Structure formats: C-alpha cells, structure tokens
C-alpha cells in the first residue's frame, strides 16, 4: 500500500499531464451523470470546491441557478465553513485558491468533495490539510466526488479521521 504523500505526488503529476481531450470527455460524462442523479435532484444547497487548474473542472455547476451554490472558506486551526458563491466577492488565498470574502456560514445538503485519489468505497487522498475530513466528521448530509478513471486505487492508507465519500461519480 502506497503512502499518501507518494499518492499525492503521483496523482498531481497525472492530473497535470492528463490529455485535454480525454479530460473534457470524462468531465462532461461525469457532470451529466451527476445532474440526473437523485442526490443532485434532492439537494437545495450544494457545496462546490473552487478548482485549481489541474483539478476536476466543476465550474459548469457554479452557475446553476436552480440550486444554492456555496463554496469552502478556510479558517484558522484547519477549520472550514461554506459561504454563498458570488463571483464578484472572491479573493485569492496564499495557496492559490479562490475563496469568498463573506463569513456567513451556510450548511449545504450536498458537498462535492475534492481529492486526488479514491477507493471504490469512497475513501480518499486529499491534499493533506484535513479540512474536509474535519468538516465531514459532523456533517449529516450527502457527499459526492467526481473522479477520473485513473484516480481509483484498490486500497488507500487510512487513519481514524478519514471519512469516506458516499457517492463516487466516474466513467
């Protein structure tokens, strides 16, 4: 079983070098799958991460006017809240991630959880900050991830804080 640091390094490289045409095809197929899913249909407030250039492109969902779209905002002590998405009220963090200037917390019905690798049963390797696992420890709503075919691994090293994602959307 590979260590999480090795997986992070390998997957970041794989994402950065992923063929553009294949990326677009898989992204389209996965988003289409998600949009017809029950968890999407039933959710009113959906938390969507703000993708970095090599991450899964969820920006198509940011303009969904049929749902309340919220985005993560990091806080001290590796905590996180979700705030309403407003394109005109974003700033760039020192980590290169766009976040809202607002501090008004919204609890979503569904969280789209980012990551670098997953198992079939929803365990994931994130970026190592633990923000999502801390938030998900007390979260009772639905969780989902969008995963390219090469990001599924047979096993991933786990610790007691790891929270599996409930729904994996992949091609």
Residue ranges of predicted features:
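N-terminal active-site beta-alpha-beta segment that forms phosphate/nucleotide-binding
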Residues: 1-101, 106
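Short, glycine/serine-rich, charged loops/turns that create anion-binding
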Residues: 53, 76, 117, 148-151
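Alpha-helical elements of the RecA-like P-loop NTPase motor core of helicases
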Residues: 59, 133-134
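Charged helix-capping and loop-helix junction motifs
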Residues: 63, 126-131
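Anionic-ligand binding patches
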Residues: 81, 113, 119
């Amino acid at each position: 079983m590979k260590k999480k640091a090795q997986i992070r390094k390998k997957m970041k490289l794989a994402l950065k070098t992923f063929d553009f045409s294949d990326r677009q095809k898989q992204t389209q197929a996965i988003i289409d799958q998600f949009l017809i899913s029950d968890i999407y249909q039933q959710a009113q407030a959906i938390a969507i991460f703000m993708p970095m250039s090599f991450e899964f492109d969820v920006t198509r969902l940011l303009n969904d006017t049929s749902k309340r779209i919220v985005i993560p905002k990091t806080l001290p002590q590796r905590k996180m809240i979700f705030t309403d998405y407003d394109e005109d009220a974003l700033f760039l963090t020192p980590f290169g991630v766009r976040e809202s200037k607002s501090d008004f917390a919204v609890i979503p019905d569904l969280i789209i959880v980012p990551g670098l690798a997953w198992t079939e049963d929803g365990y994931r390797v994130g970026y190592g900050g633990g923000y999502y696992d801390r938030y998900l420890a007390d979260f009772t709503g639905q969780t989902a991830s969008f995963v390219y075919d090469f990001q599924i691994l047979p096993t991933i090293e786990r610790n007691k804080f790891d929270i599996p994602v409930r729904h994996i959307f992949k091609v």
